[in-house]
Amino acid sequence: INDGWQNVYNSGSATSTTINGGQQNVSSGGSATSTTINSDGWQNVFSGGSATSTTINSGGWQAVYSGGSATSTTINSGGQLSVFSGSAVDITQNSGGAIETDTSSDLSGTNAKGSFSIAGGSANNMLLENGGSLMVLDGHQASDTTVGSYGTLGVVSGSVLRGTTTLLDKSRLAGDVVTNEGNLYFLNNSAATFIGTLTGTGSLTQAGGNTRFSGQLSQDGGIILQSGAAMTMDALQAKANVTTWSGTTLTLDNGSILTGSVTGDNTGAGDMTVKGASVWHPDGDSTVGALTLDNGTVDFHPLTTTRLTPVFRAVSLTAGSLSGNGRFLMNTDIASHTGDILNVTGNASGNFVLDIKNTGREPVSAGTPLQVVHTGSGDAAFTLNGGKVDAGTWEYYLSKENTDWYLKADASQPGTDNPGANNPEPPVRHTTTSADAVLDMATAPVYVFNSELQSLRFRHGDVMQNTRSPGGVWGRYTGSDNRISGGAGAGYSLSQSGMETGGDTVFELSDSRLAVGAFVSYTDNSISHNRGGSSTVGSTGGGLYATWFDNDGYYVDGVIKVNRFSNELRTRMSDGTAVKGDYHQNGFGGSLEAGRTFSLNENTWIQPYIRSTAFRAEAKDISLDNGMKAKAGATKSLQGEAGVNLGMNLEIAGTVVRPYLTTAVSHEFSDNNRVRINDRYDFTNDISGTTGKYGAGVSAQLTANAGVWAEASYQKGSNIESPVTGSVGFRINF
């Protein structure tokens, strides 16, 4: 047949046909025997048709469709057999011959590798070259496939590759999702690329050549680079352990992330480059030849565990040399004197940042240095992100000794116990932010309680004129902003807002009155630590009071009060890790105040007074989620105060208004509140000191039984400054 066609129909047959640029169609019931297909020749075997002993030469093509069959086809170099869900058996595939099919077909025959077959959705020992291809369909599998030059292995999601899948130079692996349960073997492939998801329990081996992978890659059996192979991970999310031979290269580029160890073998170790936004997570001990960071990151941090879990273990990275610029994110557990280490056996050059995470647990031997970097030689510079690392109670700093870098507990002369000629001062140690937050929170109940337990005037307003039989109810809102520096911590700001309400019964005595009552309170207290973090204290309280005042202006007021503090400690370690610890605490206290009101003239009065306040919060064990533990001893406060109020009685539009000024001085005597951190270090929260108080207020008698008041004050002392404290309230008599 020369450029014509031949149709073989039912019961028809064709024998020894030669097709030169023409076409032979074998339909149902027809048969063709000993057909020779030359260049541009074409044989179609349709459903029900059959072809036997066909020879396909260069440029020829035999197509077997669903329901059609071919037996004893010989494919010579340049020829192609295409089987589309049909059957082709006893095939002889000579070198350079191409087979195009999928795993829904039935095939058997021999090739340069030996016997091959496709049956029941399983392809075995297929050879795809010179335009040949195999599509592995969903639920099917292909084992021991070899993809030669210009061959294609297509994989549909849900199918599996088994055995050894070999991809030679100029071959192609195609598929959005490829599951490999065997060994995917790239052999001297000069420019292989794969874009998609490669997953499975198998392994990937590259011998020589260059490959580039994009998308996602997960191979439980790992990756092996050998014989000068060069692999580039380009925008790839990869999870696999990598073994590199000497002379190979692995490059992470364009934001790639590799999770897994990289190690050498008995030939040595290959080189590795991490570029740009790419990150390498070595989750096991690793060894590379030359390590180059081009603004890349090596992150030792485990992705599925934290440094506080029992499975935490240190990881070492050994490199023959180091160059470039980049970051190393590392874990340490200084408490057990272990941590990740970067070991450069040869020359190191460039600038690198160490971002080190540690725990809040206390080192057994404080101040003992922990090595994090070793270099054999070179001028590499390492700096510590944030300048410090938290280790229990104390901060650690990065110190260079020769070509090694250590974490040490003080900045001036790390590790020096005694001053010497070159170190005239003792070592300086600095507490961590976690320790500071614990020390801050230990004093907070004192300031919360004392702010709630304000003077008699805050509770009753103008009590002598506004408290009468048989009694009444009252309430007030209070708010304050306090800056506290007392104690062993770095200090904090305390913002308080809350309500207090109560009621009393007033007894008329011969020359005096006695008010006996009860009250409840709640305040919300926000704490901003000076070194970072925002904690809260919710304070719920209640108490009893009794106030006596006679007709000559004398008064005595006593209060007892209990509180329940709900503490939520929140801060951040020096590496930015959030830290928290929640606990409850009980406290109780009271105050006793006495004074007298003198009339200076018909409308002006003065009221000197003295006051004492005492408070005690229970001891408490505190645990933070970074491993720090603390025991706050019983926190005590004892204050004495003397002051004077000066006011006037005015009548405005029929309403009695009493503006007043107040000034006082108080002294805190408590100087020995103890806190023990990590069962090792004792701190004293000394909150003693003198404070001056200044304020102004006004009360107004709206009706015979109802009054309101407001007061604002300022106080400043050695340990506290309150730029503004305000209170507004009311009282209604029965």
Feature annotation, model-predicted:
Residues P363-G378, G489-F507, A630-S637:
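Short secondary-structure subsegments characteristic of cysteine-rich extracellular domains
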Residues T92-N94, D106-K113, D144-G148, R162-T165, ...:
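Extracellular beta-solenoid/beta-roll
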Residues I1-S77:
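Thr-biased low-complexity repeat/linker tracts and other Thr-enriched repetitive architectures
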Residues S214, T345, M464, S495, ...:
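Transmembrane beta-barrel domains of outer membrane proteins
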Residues R616, D625, K629-F734:
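Outer membrane beta-barrel transmembrane domains
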Residues T368, G487, S528-G532, E568-R572, ...:
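Outer-membrane beta-barrel and related beta-rich outer-membrane complex signature
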Residues N422-E602, I606, A712-S713, S718-P723:
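Outer membrane beta-barrel translocator domains of Type V secretion systems
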